[in-house]
Amino acid sequence: MMAGRKGYQSVMDENCHDKTESAYTDDRSLNGSSGSSCLKNNVIAFFLGAAVVAATQYVSIDSSLTKAVEVTSFTTSDAPAIDIAINPTRPSLDARQDFKIEGWGNQTRNDGWPSFHFEVFHFCPHLINFMYENQVHPQSRVDPSNVIYDAQHPGALAEDGFAEVLQQTLPKFYDYPVGYRLNDRPAEISAYWTLHMRIARGSEDSQWHDFASSLPEGINRIYVKKPLQWNGDHVTLFSSQTGYNILVY
């Protein structure tokens, strides 16, 4: 841009030189008129050149900023989704696809399975897989006293939330067995643990499969110990046992 500015000034100087040669003037007139005119023209040329340089630099900076914004926008929109790591003690996303419960999609109400299974459980694959993760955890087991150890996900907030929603949902179905009597008292069925046992009965990979398969169909009572403390994905302390009434089918 400096070369361009010098070229512009040279042209102005030549014009001034031509004007002084084309007409006769005395020294005073030359110094007072033509010299003043050339000086003004040079000053004008300087500021015009500076303005051109500044404008060019602004355009260059603005173009760079625009490109930076475009690159940032492209990078943000095309960035890969955050991959939430799954602890190796639980099955990976690919491994979950191999999870199949025997007869899960082939049963009908005529087989004696409750309606809520087909209306709720059958359409909740993510919920099923999440609960299945707990069942295949190395710390999930059934002790010799038939007490279930449930190695829940750290914090167990999701498990508690699922249990609350299921407990409010399943009683809406006509064959939900609230009011049945167990040991001479009303049996409030745990929807969450009913589903857990259905999953365990249908999956040989479950740490609870043998126990769940041994339960007779109908209402049963099971006892469960849940985590109180975790170290990462490892349970460091389990609670005392809690009893739940479930519907086995």
UniProtKB/Swiss-Prot annotation:
Function: Unknown function: part of the gene cluster that mediates the biosynthesis of domoic acid (DA) and derivatives, natural products with neurochemical activity acting as ionotropic glutamate receptor (iGluR) agonists, thus being neurotoxins causing amnesic shellfish poisoning (ASP).
Domain of life: Eukaryota
GO BP: any one term: cellular response to phosphate starvation
UniProt lineage: Eukaryota, Sar, Stramenopiles, Ochrophyta, Bacillariophyta
Induction of the gene: Up-regulated under phosphate limitation and by increasing partial pressure of CO(2).
Protein's name in the database: Domoic acid biosynthesis cluster protein B
